[in-house]
Amino acid sequence: MHGTVLPPLKKGWQATLDLRFHQAGGKTVLASAQHVGPLTVQRPFYPEEETCHLYLLHPPGGIVGGDELTISAHLAPGCHTLITMPGASKFYRSSGAQALVRQQLTLAPQATLEWLPQDAIFFPGANARLFTTFHLCASSRLLAWDLLCLGRPVIGETFSHGTLSNRLEVWVDDEPLLVERLQLQEGELSSVAERPWVGTLLCYPATDALLDGVRDALAPLGLYAGASLTDRLLTVRFLSDDNLICQRVMRDVWQFLRPHLTGKSPVLPRIWLT
C-alpha cells in the first residue's frame, strides 16, 4: 500500500477501530470489530437485506488536542457496506497539541463502500489533522463524502484562529487517482473563499452521463460548486454559507448516483431521520 507516513502523537485518547466485513449467507456481515479506547460501532442494521448499514461512534464529548484516532475498514470481495455516524464530529479548541484522525478504507474486488459521515465541526482554535485514504481495486465501487464546517456559522462564529490539515487520497490498484490537501491556518480562509462549509463527494467508477447529472444537482450552490471526471473518478467540490443547502445537495447527489453505481434505490440511514 502507498500513503503518507504520519508521526505518532502522545497524550489524549489513543483510540483505534478495525472493521472487517465478509460475505455470509448472501449478505454482508461485520465479521470483526476490534477497538481500543472510545471508538466503537452499533450493531449493524439491514434495511436492504444483504447490505450492511453501520453506525460509527466517535468519542463522547468531541475530539481535542492530543487525541489520536485510527479507523480502518476492510471489505472482502462482494461486500456492500454503508457507514455513517449519528452526529457531527466536533474538534474543540486546543492549547497547542494536535488532534489526529487517520481513516483507511480498503475494498477488495467487487466490494462496494458508501462512506457517509456526518459533518466535522472545527471550533476556533482547533488544531487538527485528518488523513483519509481509500484503497480500491478496479472493480470496487465507492460513494463517499467529506463535509467540513469551519467555526459555528449558525451563531456567527468563524474559524478565526487555529490550524486544519485535511488530506484525502484515492488509490486504485495501487495507483493514485486523487491526492489533495486542504491547509488552513490562523483564520486565513481565502483558499475556501471565506466560506465556512467545505464539501467533497467522490464516486467511482463513473461516466460522463453521471457527471452531467451531478452538475445539474449542484445548481442550488451556484458558482461555488463543480464536478470533474478523471480516470472514472467523479469528484464533486463545493463551498457554501448554508449548512442546510450543503446537506440537501450532498444527499441529492448521493440519491442520484446510488442507483447507477449499485443498482439499488436510495435507502436513507434511519439515524438521519431522527
UniProtKB/Swiss-Prot annotation:
Q: Name one GO cellular component term.
A: cytoplasm
Q: Which Pfam families match?
A: UreD
InterPro entries given for it?
Answer: UreD
Query: Which keywords annotate this record?
Result: Chaperone, Cytoplasm, Nickel insertion
Q: Report the locations given in the UniProt record.
A: Cytoplasm
- Has keyword Cytoplasm? yes
Q: Give the GO molecular function terms.
A: nickel cation binding
Source domain of life is Bacteria
Family that this chain belongs to: Belongs to the UreD family.
This protein's assembly is summarised as: UreD, UreF and UreG form a complex that acts as a GTP-hydrolysis-dependent molecular chaperone, activating the urease apoprotein by helping to assemble the nickel containing metallocenter of UreC. The UreE protein probably delivers the nickel.
HAMAP family named among the record's database cross-references: UreD (MF_01384)
Q: What does this protein do?
A: Required for maturation of urease via the functional incorporation of the urease nickel metallocenter.
Q: What is this protein called?
A: Urease accessory protein UreD
Organism the protein comes from: Klebsiella pneumoniae subsp. pneumoniae (strain ATCC 700721 / MGH 78578)
Quote the gene name from the UniProt entry: ureD
